[in-house]
Amino acid sequence: MTRLFLSFILIFAAGFAGAQTFPTKTVTVIIGVAPGGTLDTLARQIAAGLSPILKQPVVVENVTGAAGLVGFQRLMKSEPDGHTLNFSNMSLLIIPHMHPKGGFDPLRDLAPVAGVATVPMVMAVSNKSGIKDLPSLIAHMRRNPGKVNLGNGGPGTTAHLSQALFLNIVKADAQLIQYRGTGPVLADVMSGVIDGIIDQTVTLMPLHTSKRAHAIAVSTPRRIAQMPDVPTFAEGGVPEFDLRIWNGFLAPKGTPRPVLERLAAAISQVIDSPEYKERVEK
């Protein structure tokens, strides 16, 4: 019994010592989407704040493919020592159902590190679409089934699922155009190649405030301070579309708890800082 107790003490001490010296090299944050979208933007903003706290470079690597599965496969092959992380959102729960042979089980393979934000969704339309508000968009889709084009960053993404949910609620039909990442979608919304998009506020707020696109609804109970001129979905006649997306950091299963706690504390320090809050609100 004494020997067993001493073994537990040694294991705990080794983990604590590892956390005290962690990190010893560059920390890589994998995201499973192309540059330009919400995940990419948030990950890079947080990575910039983490580097001085952890006193090591924190880099973001875009590892795309199979709705994020390829990025998680890379994470699962990495050492569970905290130097490789993944930044994702609730769409990770869809991956095993889209790719059942991919060998990925979030409950089995991942260790949660820190939640970062719960973000509402925004419907925005191209300035060239002629659409002024949510009721007129819905009426247009019902009069012209399949004629409206909505873009998203790929199958299984939160944007894709949000658009499918919206169409189901309003009983209308539109073409859901799937891109490889959100960046190209935004470019096509601004140029008028497609009519609109539903995505997170972090992605669409800059387009609306700069008048490069027109936000017509936000999925919050009340209007948000950053876009006070944008009505809620409920104001537009669709109260059922009440949706917010969570984003967070994950590590490979088996990462020592003291290391996870060190990372969580550092991430919390970043997202609570005035500098980070100012960047996100812009």
Language-model features: locations:
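Hinge/capping helix and adjacent helix->loop/strand transition within the periplasmic-binding protein
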Residues: 77-83, 97-184, 233, 244-279
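N-terminal (or domain-start) structured segment
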Residues: 19-109, 147, 155, 171-200, ...
